[in-house]
């Protein structure tokens, strides 16, 4: 049974909650986590690199000098790869690096990293995360009050734009939503700050 304290946004202890064991209490599978992180990084890769082959570089139609009699090595074009301004051998072209992984693997990886965070006591539960207006200073004060002023991932149940705007200018802070939680973001954060509504959504979606 995984129990943890619940705090309000001022850092005051308001109760206790049981973390769902199906999500926060499994034995982490490092191999699957590695596969899913690799997949995530490949999927977000731009793949826009591009260079010209010798067939695509402008110019080079004229033979630079005659074939024989100069004492120099024979050359057919000034756009051959060994020349300055020549084409690139096996020039990279724009392509997609993305590939798919099955949902079971992604779900297991997420539960693994959430369980690791819980085992390290790096999951902080808040009764409700809300902001009446976008205020970065107030949000920073809240994070400090709950002991999360380092690299922090804040997870809410709904897309509250006031919370998003309040957190986006704080170095090391990222705000995301429970239904789109991913392995890379959780791994990249030192602390996980979750409100009770988000905790319920995580259990419903990923358990």
Task: Identify the function of each model-found stretch.
Residues 54-90:
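Glycine/serine-rich anion-binding loops at beta->alpha junctions
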């Amino acid at each position: 049974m995984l129990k943890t304290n619940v705090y309000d946004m001022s850092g005051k202890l308001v109760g206790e909650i049981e973390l769902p064991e199906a999500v926060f209490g499994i034995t982490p599978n490092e191999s699957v986590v590695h596969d899913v992180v690799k997949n995530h990084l490949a999927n977000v890769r731009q793949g826009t690199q591009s260079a010209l082959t010798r067939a695509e570089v402008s110019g080079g139609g004229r033979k630079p000098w005659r074939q024989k009699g100069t004492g120099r090595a024979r050359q057919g074009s000034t756009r051959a790869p060994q020349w300055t301004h020549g084409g690139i051998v096996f020039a990279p072209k724009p392509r997609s690096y993305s590939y798919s992984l099955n949902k079971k693997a992604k779900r297991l990886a997420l539960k693994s990293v959430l369980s690791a965070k819980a085992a390290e006591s790096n999951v902080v539960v808040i009764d409700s995360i809300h902001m009446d207006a976008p205020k970065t200073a107030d949000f920073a004060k809240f994070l400090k009050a709950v002991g999360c002023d380092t690299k922090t991932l804040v997870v809410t149940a709904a897309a509250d734009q006031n919370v998003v705007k309040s957190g986006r200018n704080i170095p090391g802070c990222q705000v995301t939503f429970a239904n789109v939680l991913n392995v890379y973001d959780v791994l990249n954060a030192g602390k996980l700050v979750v409100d009770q509504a988000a905790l319920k959504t995580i259990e419903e979606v990923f358990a």
